[in-house]
Design a protein with these regions (language model features):
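Short, basic, glycine/proline-bearing loop/turn elements
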Residues: 26-28, 94-100, 127-131
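A transmembrane-helix-recognition feature enriched in membrane-embedded lipid enzymes
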Residues: 2-41, 47, 65, 85-95
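Residues at the C-termini of beta-strands that transition into short coil/loop
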Residues: 43, 80, 101, 159, ...
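A generic local structural motif
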Residues: 37-42, 61-63, 110-112, 167-169
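Non-catalytic C-terminal accessory region of glycerolipid acyltransferases
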Residues: 2-18, 107-227
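Phosphate-binding P-loop
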Residues: 45-47, 116-117
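Catalytic core of membrane glycerolipid acyltransferases/transacylases, capturing the structured
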Residues: 32-33, 47-104, 112
Length: 227
């Protein structure tokens, strides 16, 4: 598969003006000031080349926060219902998200994800496919591993800490709890598209993310700057 390293600089994935505007005028103040956001492990994020970013999902806050904190633009596969939510829908679309129908085989979304990976983009996928009240990865789906197997892109586990407490399922108003984004070590793509290989890689992603969630808080461990 082509890597962004093989493209002239002008053709490599770049954030759009609207992406930059929303990130720094809206998402940054909310994450950094209101939620006292902190980051760990940003040096583990490959700066170029195709990448499948996998994360836990506990809140509607997750897509913009993940897109803001990682040091490269990320396009998201998000459930189609989110695009009908006032304010949130236009926001996540401006941040590079594209819709996928949950519970159905959405070939167009898969083609979009593969196309972006072929151009060297990072594509973000929430491993469960839907929010979990616990904030952990509880019921991981095989889609991320399949994308990785088809594209040859590595998987990057990312833990979003406390977003389920800040604005979880059923909550109308946010709670201003401290948020943290933790990045793990990249995981190689599955050796094949066979179901046992996809399941093994998916399980490795689940274990890596949940281990990051259980790690000591940033108050006792060194923290890297967000970007």
């Amino acid at each position: 598969m082509p890597s962004s390293q093989n493209f002239p600089l002008i053709l490599r994935p770049q954030p759009s003006p609207s992406y930059r505007l929303v990130q720094w005028l809206l998402v940054a103040p909310i994450f950094r000031l209101l939620f006292r956001g902190r980051c760990r492990g940003m040096e583990r994020v490959p700066r170029q080349g195709p990448l499948v970013v996998v994360a836990n999902h506990g809140s509607h806050l997750d897509p913009p926060l993940l897109g803001h904190t990682l040091p490269r633009p990320v396009s998201f596969m998000a459930k189609a219902e989110l695009f009908t939510v006032p304010v949130l829908g236009p926001l996540i679309r401006s941040l590079g998200a594209y819709p996928v129908s949950r519970g159905a085989s959405d070939r167009e979304a898969i083609r979009t994800a593969l196309g972006r990976l072929e151009l060297g983009w990072a594509t973000g996928i929430f491993l469960d496919g839907t929010r979990q009240a616990s904030g952990r990865v509880e019921d991981p789906q095989l889609g991320a591993a399949l994308l990785s197997a088809r594209s040859g892109a590595a998987l990057l586990p990312v833990a979003l800490v406390n977003t389920h407490r800040a604005l979880g399922p059923g909550q109308t108003w946010p709670r201003l709890v401290p948020l943290e984004v933790r990045v793990g070590l990249p995981i190689p793509p599955p050796p094949s598209r066979r179901r046992p290989d996809l399941e093994a890689t998916t399980r490795a992603c689940q274990e890596a993310i949940n281990a990051l969630l259980e790690a000591p808080s940033a108050s006792t461990v060194g923290v890297n700057p967000c970007r």
